[in-house]
Amino acid sequence: MVNVLLLATEASAEKGFGLNLDLLDTNLINLGILIAVLLYFAPGFIGKILSERRATIEQAIKEAEQRQQEAATALAEQQQNLTQAQAEAEKILALAETRAQEVKQRIELQAEQDIERMKTAANQEMDSEKDKAIAQLRSILASKALAKVESQLQETLDENAQQQLIDSSIGRLGGQL
């Protein structure tokens, strides 16, 4: 085998048949041969692979477009739901504000009525206490006046004057009957 290499090297030195040790030239020639063989024998095989790949890519694109349309539809639906929810929230807020105002007015009216009722009750209680106090004062004054009159009558009237007073009082009562 060593002999073959020696012969090939000698032949290459004479520019004849032999091994070409220039790798760049050799690789280009080999690459050209490989491409020619592939183009001749493998167009159906490569075409089949490329068409399958193309079909796969087209299917992926269709699926992506379909998902995009579904997403757009879902987005539109969700935006509509959001708009409806916002409108409903605004209605609820307006209703709550209206109810709050109504409750506030009722509470204020009830408070005013309670204040008036308390004032009336206080005035009635004061009038009642005033009437009681006046009645007590009259009773006390009447008792004191009677006590004073009795004491004055006992001091100023003797028995004879008392008898004349009783007789005149009986006479007046007898005339009225």
UniProtKB/Swiss-Prot annotation:
Subcellular location: Cellular thylakoid membrane
Membrane topology recorded in Swiss-Prot or TrEMBL: Single-pass membrane protein
Keywords from the UniProt entry: ATP synthesis, CF(0), Hydrogen ion transport, Ion transport, Membrane, Thylakoid, Transmembrane, Transmembrane helix, Transport
One matching Pfam family: ATP-synt_B
Domain of life of the organism encoding this protein: Bacteria
GO molecular function, one term: proton-transporting ATP synthase activity, rotational mechanism
Record function comment: F(1)F(0) ATP synthase produces ATP from ADP in the presence of a proton or sodium gradient. F-type ATPases consist of two structural domains, F(1) containing the extramembraneous catalytic core and F(0) containing the membrane proton channel, linked together by a central stalk and a peripheral stalk. During catalysis, ATP synthesis in the catalytic domain of F(1) is coupled via a rotary mechanism of the central stalk subunits to proton translocation. Component of the F(0) channel, it forms part of the peripheral stalk, linking F(1) to F(0).
Family (UniProt): Belongs to the ATPase B chain family.
Protein name stated in the entry: ATP synthase subunit b
UniProt organism field: Trichodesmium erythraeum (strain IMS101)
